[in-house]
A protein has these predicted regions:
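Aromatic, loop-rich ligand-recognition surfaces of beta-strand-rich domains
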Residues: 1-92, 380
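Proline-centered linker/hinge motifs at extracellular inter-domain junctions
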Residues: 93-97
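A short beta-strand segment in extracellular, disulfide-stabilized domains
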Residues: 110-120
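Solvent-exposed loop segments of extracellular immunoglobulin-like
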Residues: 124-131
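Low-complexity "stalk/linker" and mucin-like segments enriched in Ser/Thr/Pro/Ala/Gly
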Residues: 133-148, 680-681
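Aromatic (Trp/Tyr) and acidic
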Residues: 186-289, 322-350, 384-408, 436-474, ...
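Long, well-ordered core segments of solenoidal/helical folds
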Residues: 209-249, 293-311, 358-374, 411-429, ...
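C-terminal beta-rich recognition modules with glycine/proline-rich loops and embedded aromatic residues
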Residues: 469, 534-542, 547-639, 659-674, ...
Length: 799
């Protein structure tokens, strides 16, 4: 304490999980007598009992510090859940404690909910006076009520503001500040996604990875889903549900209530895999042919398990459970994945096979009839995903069925989000979504929720949604983001920790990393800002791509930055097994977005993709590049008819997060030419804009600067103090124990160079140099980590 307090009583509540944390063997209390910590005299009742407060009394003392010492019990850890110290009545008056909450963003003309708090000791009066004020900022701030801690504020002008909350108890005062970034509304209308329709890949980087997913990983997932001995459950649950619907006895469900999920994801992956042109590759063609037969078999079985009103969830059907009775049963989550698989199936068929698509509409319509404002049922999901799927369905049916066909699905998505309140941080139901400004809780749920919010914000233009989404983006990217693009420290249950708490034994669940890609892509569609695709690229090339090994024979649920754990074939919760391939095989969707008269080139991959409905025509785009190993890219533009539109080419900024600083700085373009003639385009929001009339055969060539960069973390990230990481373009690099001592020191003066190694890890650009002790170092791309055993780390000591 800053001032001496008087006390004669304290309580302690021990943490005991009957596992790794147990009650202590013994404990002692000490206090600071002015020169040393001494035993607390006459303490009585100091207990070691679980599930209660252990109260201790003693003769009154005056001190500035108390110390609690305890001895561990065997090999178990020991901890305290809560420790209370009681004022005996003679302590001095302490200033109030004031908190203003987290920094946030506001999209005009929206408002921000200020959730300040004030704690006081009740001296000299029961409650202090409080006041909100503007400390700085370019415009006027209007508070709904400046005299209460929780209120709202609006801003007359865009810019950066600092708001102050002050509490005064009559003798002393204290204050706290919150930073608010106020921005203008995003441009309207938002951009549109590019569906993954038939495409080619020539990239020497991407083609073998996509091939291995199709030839190795997806067949493995199919085998697991079809094996009746796999305890997690699979396609057999749909057969059992169909038996129950047909009135046949003995139907039995296998696995968790959410066991339909990985079957839907695997079906979706198979459908998207059909979009890749095998280009004469017999292995790809054979795998695709086999998967087409599986698709037909699975679709028939899934449709047989759909109830007459459109509802589908096999365990509920088999066991007769009541719908919408337990938000933790993943009803919405699985429905969302069914819808997304159905859309992929419809796209795969070129719109010629409507069975799954019609089933998805029946399922969504079932939810629309039952869930919503009174007199319908109030409801929100325990695991978000359906919100994204409903908006995706809405956008798709607007194309297939006409304008207005998707309105009910957007309304339902917004209702599910708006209903989140009075719950827990774990599933982001602790506050209304429009008042959530910090990324908290389970990371997959969070990123799916935030992506769904971004979708709803795009479709409705709701500024409170936009403000919350921008605030959450800042929290994720600038406070809780791993240098690999991974999300979720795992300090809470598979989720986010405190700001700047980013230990390297991180969780970074593969599903959460895929959610981050969805989130950033939606923000790019909202703001047309290249920084979101800089982040998407970072996550794609590192956190997601490293989720499977090079041969796509094994995968990993988590992606720590310091680990010796090998990937594996399956998991007790195989939620990621289909998410990874459906994400990576959707490469065209991450590569391009479009506007009415514009195409955005967001990623660089040797490929041929057709973008439809731009300036009234379709445009075939063929990229030729060896990126990320080489920065040269050639793009051939082939519109079906000559049209005027803007081609927006992302100019990467490797400085993606305020948490990390890269040196040397490497940004911009080295060159840009149209049809062989050098041009200097306008660069706006991270895009080089080429607005002209395009005809078939036009070419654009550009070169991106690529070089080795050192990365240093913000000093508030304790785990990385005195450490350095390396990157090359979008790739973060790892040091592996099979090549060197991963506890060696990489001096700041060490010379580093990139070198191509065609025979290592399928062909990679390594970083070479020497450690401070003169021994050679070798760093490999993060995505290729742990393919040779041993330990693999991102951050090395630099002193």
């Amino acid at each position: 304490w800053a001032l001496p307090i008087s006390t004669a009583r304290l309580d302690v509540y021990w943490f005991d999980d009957h596992g790794g944390v147990r009650l202590p063997k013994a404990c002692r209390l000490k206090y600071w007598d002015g020169s040393a910590f001494v035993d607390l005299p006459g303490a009585s009742g100091l207990g070691l009992e679980e599930n209660r407060f252990n109260t201790t009394t003693f003769p009154e003392i005056t001190t500035t510090s108390l110390r609690f010492e305890f001895d561990g019990n065997g090999d178990s850890s020991t901890g305290i859940l809560e420790w209370r110290v009681y004022d005996s009545g003679k302590s001095p008056n302490f200033p109030p404690t004031v908190s203003t909450g987290v920094d946030r963003a506001v999209v005009q003309p929206g408002e921000t909910w200020l959730n300040g708090s004030v704690k006081d000791d009740g001296k000299p009066r029961p409650a202090p006076a409080v006041k909100w004020s503007k400390a700085s900022g370019p415009g006027k701030v209007s508070f709904a009520n400046a005299s209460v801690p929780e209120t709202t504020a609006r801003f007359s002008a865009a810019g950066n503001y600092v708001l102050k909350l002050t509490a005064d108890d009559g003798q002393s005062n204290a204050s706290s500040e919150v930073h608010v970034s106020v921005v203008a509304r995003p441009p309207m209308p938002p951009l549109s996604p590019v569906w993954t329709t038939p495409y080619q890949v020539s990239s020497p980087f991407w083609r073998p990875r996509l091939k291995n997913l199709i030839v190795n990983w997806i067949p493995h997932c199919v085998q697991q889903c079809e094996d009746p001995e796999v305890k997690e459950g699979g396609i057999g649950n749909f057969v059992q549900a169909a038996r129950k619907l047909a009135g046949q006895p003995g139907a039995k469900h296998t696995g968790a209530v959410f066991a339909n999920t990985w079957v839907y994801n695997t079906l979706e992956s198979m459908c998207i895999a059909q979009m890749l042109d095998p280009q004469g590759d017999a292995e790809i063609a054979a795998a695709q042919a086999s998967q087409r037969r599986t698709i037909e078999d699975w679709v028939t079985k899934m449709l047989s398990a759909q109830e007459p009103d459109g509802y589908i969830l096999t365990q509920y059907t088999i066991e007769g459970q009541r719908r919408w009775s337990n938000k933790h049963d993943h009803e919405d989550f699985q429905a969302g994945h069914f819808i997304e698989a159905a859309i992929a199936h419809h796209v795969m068929s070129g719109g010629k096979d409507p069975r799954m698509f019609d089933a998805a509409k029946r399922l969504a319509d079932c939810w629309v009839r039952n869930i919503g404002p009174a007199p319908k049922r109030a409801w929100y999901p325990g695991h978000q995903e359906m919100e994204m799927a409903l908006v995706k369905l809405a956008r798709y049916v607007e194309q297939t069925d006409g304008p207005g066909a998707g309105t009910a699905y957007i309304d339902l998505a917004k209702f599910l989000l708006d209903s989140r309140k009075d719950g827990d941080e774990y599933d982001q139901s602790h506050a209304p979504v429009t008042r959530q400004y910090e990324a908290v809780g389970h990371a997959v749920r969070a990123l799916y929720s935030y992506a769904g919010m971004a979708d709803v914000a795009m479709e409705t233009g709701d500024t409170d949604y936009q403000s919350a989404v921008q605030s959450l983006w800042n929290s994720v990217v600038n406070k809780k983001y791993y240098v690999t693009g991974g999300i979720g420290s795992g300090e809470t249950s598979e989720g986010f920790g405190k700001e700047f708490s980013l230990p390297n034994n991180s969780y970074c669940e593969s599903c959460a990393n895929c959610g981050q890609l969805h989130f950033q892509t939606r923000l790019q569609m909202t703001w047309r800002d290249g920084r979101h695709m800089d982040l998407a690229e970072e996550t794609l090339f590192n956190a997601i791509l490293g989720g499977v090994d090079l041969d796509a024979q094994n995968y990993t649920y988590t992606n720590p930055l310091d680990s010796s754990a090998q990937r594996y074939k399956w998991h007790v919760c195989p939620c990621c097994v289909g998410i990874i391939p459906r994400t990576l095989l959707s490469l065209p969707t991450w590569t391009y977005t479009k506007g009415k008269d514009a195409i955005y080139v967001n990623q660089f991959a040797g490929s041929t993709v057709t973008v439809d409905n731009v300036a009234g025509t379709s445009v075939q785009l063929t990229q030729t590049t060896d990126y990320p190993w080489n920065g040269k890219v050639e793009l051939e533009v082939n519109p079906a008819t000559s049209k005027t539109f803007a081609l927006n080419i992302r100019v990467p900024n490797r400085q993606t997060s305020l948490l990390y600083t890269n040196t040397p700085g490497i940004d911009g373009l080295l060159s840009l030419a149209v049809n062989g003639k050098s041009v200097k385009p306008m660069i706006e929001r991270g895009y080089a804009i080429l607005d002209r009339t395009w005809k078939a055969g036009d070419t654009v060539e550009w070169e991106l600067p690529l070089a080795v960069q050192r990365v240093v973390a913000d000093h508030r990230i304790v785990a990385n103090r005195g450490r350095v990481a390396l990157r090359y373009g979008p790739l973060i690099y790892n040091f592996e124990s099979v090549d060197q001592d991963v506890n060696a020191v990489l001096a700041s003066s060490a010379s580093l160079a990139a070198e191509w190694k065609p025979d290592l890890l399928g062909g990679v650009l390594v970083i070479k140099g020497r450690f401070a002790d003169g021994k050679p170092l070798l760093a490999i791309p993060n995505y290729a980590r742990l393919n040779r055993g041993g330990r693999s780390v991102v951050w090395m000591k630099d002193r």
